[in-house]
């Protein structure tokens, strides 16, 4: 269909769409998405082609700004030059160090216990994990990142506002930043309410007269000066706070929900994990949970890895081509103005890289770990031996890898 192209089938079943196209055309092919030409390169070589592309050849900002700016706000993430985004990530990372995570663990535990005591009764029952994990993640993230002052203002309705923001990421939003439709109105209202809440928190911090080193807000207020000497405005700080919390909340709530759903279908795995936690915290869980304890839970971390492999939060990553771009080892040239697209989620579900790829098998990571600790599993090329740890064990920074749950390259998740 002209203009619409493959938007419907791609939007409904992206991985099946990619596989059908691959069988007909190979790993490199193009399709029309609501008037935009998308050139797809599947597999690790595609990851390397797009994620290691030069800034002069492709632009994440041009690809995403009309989608992300109404959600996050102006002046941050993709509504600014790339060098500013890199600086913003550095500002935020001050509060995302190992030392910070050590401090966050008891806060997260306290929030989870409060949530359980308030919402669950007895020894058994049912819950909607999509709802509970969204709320729980918001409460734990806001408490640890933004402090008690913000956490005390939040209730379940705040999770609904973040859900309204999240619904601003659709193929329709990719083409039209603003339309007179209910989901657009809810997105904009949620952005305004959340932004005003964060601005109020910033003003309260400043009025106190002393900026400490307790949370992300303190870190941003103390460190948000760009290398050219300009300082982020309070509105930009509030917008960056939306982006940081939303990025973590979206990923963590979805992943933890899938984690629990898979546990529900595997009683034996439940028992194994229960015994592993007992081995670390004591038979009656008498020890206080610490950050170091979490690193000892090999099966828990393998289950997280396997959950992310089967359920990557984003099915597509794309860039806008800003200069005619040759595709390596082919005769193809992607013209300026078109888009390049990769799908690490598709690769992680491919039998070419993971035997029995559609099956949930956390113990597959036991075997993978036996090879250089599982760090560079399948990774090739630049940075293959360099690592990053998202909290469930080290993985390679190399982008030519079949396992990229959080993307890679300069736009890799923090």
UniProtKB/Swiss-Prot annotation:
This protein's record includes keyword Metal-binding: yes
Listed transmembrane segments: none
Keyword Lipid metabolism: yes
Domain of life: Eukaryota
Taxonomic lineage from the root: Eukaryota, Fungi, Dikarya, Ascomycota, Saccharomycotina
Source organism of the structure: Pichia kudriavzevii
Main function: Sterol 14alpha-demethylase that plays a critical role in the third module of ergosterol biosynthesis pathway, being ergosterol the major sterol component in fungal membranes that participates in a variety of functions. The third module or late pathway involves the ergosterol synthesis itself through consecutive reactions that mainly occur in the endoplasmic reticulum (ER) membrane. In filamentous fungi, during the initial step of this module, lanosterol (lanosta-8,24-dien-3beta-ol) can be metabolized to eburicol.
Protein name: Lanosterol 14-alpha demethylase
Family membership: Belongs to the cytochrome P450 family.
């Amino acid at each position: 269909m002209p203009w619409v192209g493959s938007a419907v089938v791609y939007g409904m079943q992206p991985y099946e769409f990619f596989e059908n196209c691959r069988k007909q055309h190979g790993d490199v092919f193009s399709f029309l998405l609501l008037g935009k030409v998308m050139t797809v390169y599947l597999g690790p070589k595609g990851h390397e082609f797009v994620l290691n592309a030069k800034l002069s050849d492709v632009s994440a900002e041009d690809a995403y700004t009309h989608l992300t700016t109404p959600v996050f706000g102006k002046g941050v993430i993709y509504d600014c030059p790339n060098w500013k985004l890199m600086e913003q990530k550095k500002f935020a990372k001050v509060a995302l160090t190992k030392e910070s995570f050590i401090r966050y663990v008891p806060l997260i535990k306290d929030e989870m216990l409060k949530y359980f005591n308030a919402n669950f009764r007895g020894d058994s029952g049912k819950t909607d994990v999509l709802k509970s994990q969204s709320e729980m993640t918001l409460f734990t993230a806001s408490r640890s990142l933004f402090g008690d002052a913000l956490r005390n203002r939040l209730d379940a309705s705040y999770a609904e506002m973040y859900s309204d923001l999240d619904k601003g990421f659709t193929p329709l939003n990719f083409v039209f930043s603003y339309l007179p439709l209910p989901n657009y109105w809810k997105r904009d209202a949620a952005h305004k309410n959340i932004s005003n809440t964060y601005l109020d928190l910033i003003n309260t911090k400043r009025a106190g007269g002393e900026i400490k080193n307790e949370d992300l807000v303190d870190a941003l207020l103390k460190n948000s000066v760009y290398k050219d000497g300009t300082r982020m405005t309070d509105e930009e700080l509030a917008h960056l706070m939306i982006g940081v919390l939303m990025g973590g909340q979206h990923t963590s709530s979805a992943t933890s929900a899938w984690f629990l759903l898979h546990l529900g279908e595997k009683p034996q795995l439940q028992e194994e994990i229960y015994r592993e936690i007992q081995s670390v915290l004591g038979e009656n869980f008498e020890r206080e949970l610490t950050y170091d304890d979490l690193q000892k839970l090999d099966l828990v971390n393998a289950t997280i890895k396997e959950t992310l492999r089967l359920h990557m939060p984003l099915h597509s990553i794309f860039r806008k081509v800003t200069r005619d771009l040759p595709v390596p080892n082919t005769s193809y040239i992607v013209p300026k103005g078109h888009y390049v697209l990769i799908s690490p989620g598709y690769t992680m579900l491919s039998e070419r890289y993971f035997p029995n790829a559609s099956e949930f098998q956390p113990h597959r990571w036991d075997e993978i770990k036996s090879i250089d600790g599982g760090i560079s599993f399948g990774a090739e090329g630049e940075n293959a031996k360099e690592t990053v740890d998202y909290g469930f064990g080290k993985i390679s920074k190399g982008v030519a890898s079949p396992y990229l749950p959080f993307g890679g390259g300069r736009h890799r998740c923090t």
